[in-house]
Regions:
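Alpha-helical hydrophobic helix detector
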Residues: 2-15
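Internal low-complexity, small-residue/proline-rich segments
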Residues: 18-361
Length: 361
């Protein structure tokens, strides 16, 4: 009898686990749909889409825009800053007005999650709609984020030329692609409906990205973590960074980053929903979903500033697919095996003729 019961449990357990994951996947899709509704409500009210990063990104108290910096460690309470995420912009349209009212946009945006942060009360919050229930890497939940807006598109660029020219937002990389990115959302200058000749239904707006593993620096990185690009340069071409990180083999390094999208326990810094950057709320379509390569930064493994470019791919723990929110509000499951050219084209506002044929919708 015991053996029979054990066999029945063995048969039923996978079915139960599958049903639970199916429910989590549906909830993940619903979260993205809610984000999509908020984005469209924002556009209807403002006549443009949310900015993933405001200008100036970093200026001193006199208003002088800083050109050179590699992180926000030196930001003081009196600085002028603009690295507020698209997530922050849509909060009022997600019935989160209470949190919005707590954010002091006229004071410096700070990533250190202590009482000295101007917005600590607002950011010391968990927003369930920003958390994928299947994401096993979620930690304390507070300020954490599983969903990212598509800024880079088919480029690895973050919105500025490099970490020494953070105030240069126009121009092209060595591959001719715009340093402002070609995704649905553009740092510093908002996109509008007229900027989508391919149509909203053919352009990815948001997707999911597994949070960092939260491991210690003495451990190997997982696919959820970021590394510094081997042979890094300040402004790599798309294929250069893709090839450099495609064949990477995990190694212990102080330059690995384990806290993407997270506020790890014991850490005073958050990389969650309030903040701009590839370390927190932005992604691109340079690499396919759940790719076998390693996400990486070209100048730093913590690509939080606009001049720190990166491959930040869509990733999930749903199996062999990711959920993608398109500009018309539709949410589609995209398989890992999607053709890379198609995936990159779906990440752009205006693909070349024929690029979006054979797509996923």
């Amino acid at each position: 009898m015991i053996a029979i019961i054990a066999i029945l449990i063995g048969l039923l357990l996978p079915a139960v686990q599958g049903a639970r994951e199916s429910a989590r996947r549906v909830q993940c899709q619903n979260n993205l749909k809610q984000i999509g509704l908020a984005v469209m409500a924002y556009e209807s009210a403002k006549k443009h889409f949310p900015l993933p990063r405001l200008a100036p990104d970093n200026a001193d108290r006199r208003g002088v825009v800083r050109a050179s910096y590699t992180s926000y460690d030196s930001v003081t309470r009196s600085d002028m800053t603009g690295f507020y995420s698209a997530h922050v912009q849509i909060l009022p349209f997600m019935e989160e007005t209470g949190i919005t009212k707590l954010i002091k946009f006229d004071q410096a945006q700070m990533k250190e999650m202590t009482s000295t942060n101007n917005n600590f009360t607002a950011y010391n919050q968990a927003i369930p709609s920003f958390i994928c229930p299947s994401d096993g890497n979620k930690g304390r939940i507070i300020s954490e984020n599983s969903y990212r807006c598509n800024t880079g598109g088919s480029t690895p660029y973050g919105g500025a030329r490099n970490s020494s020219q953070q105030n240069v937002h126009e121009g092209s990389g060595p591959d001719g692609l715009p340093i402002s990115g070609n995704g649905a959302f553009r740092p510093f200058t908002p996109t509008k409906l007229k900027d989508f000749p391919d149509g909203l239904s053919k352009t990815a707006f948001f997707s999911e990205r597994t949070m960092g593993s939260g491991r210690a620096k003495t451990e190997l990185p997982t696919k959820a973590d970021l590394i510094t690009m081997p042979g890094r340069t300040q402004l790599p071409g798309r294929d250069q960074i893709f090839n450099a990180c495609a064949g990477y083999r995990p190694a212990v390094s102080e330059f690995n980053f384990f806290a993407a999208g997270r506020w790890p326990t014991g850490d005073s810094w958050s990389n969650g929903w309030p903040f701009s950057g590839y370390d927190a709320t932005q992604y691109n379509h340079v690499a396919p979903p759940n790719w076998s390569g390693q996400d990486c930064g070209s100048w730093s493994a913590i690509p939080d500033t606009p001049g720190e470019h990166a491959i930040l791919s869509a990733r999930s723990q749903h199996g062999t697919m990711v959920n993608v929110l398109f500009g018309d509000g539709g949410v589609v499951q995209v398989d890992d095996g999607v053709d890379l050219a198609v995936w990159r084209a779906l990440g752009t506002r205006a693909a070349e003729p024929g690029e979006k044929s054979g797509g996923v919708r």
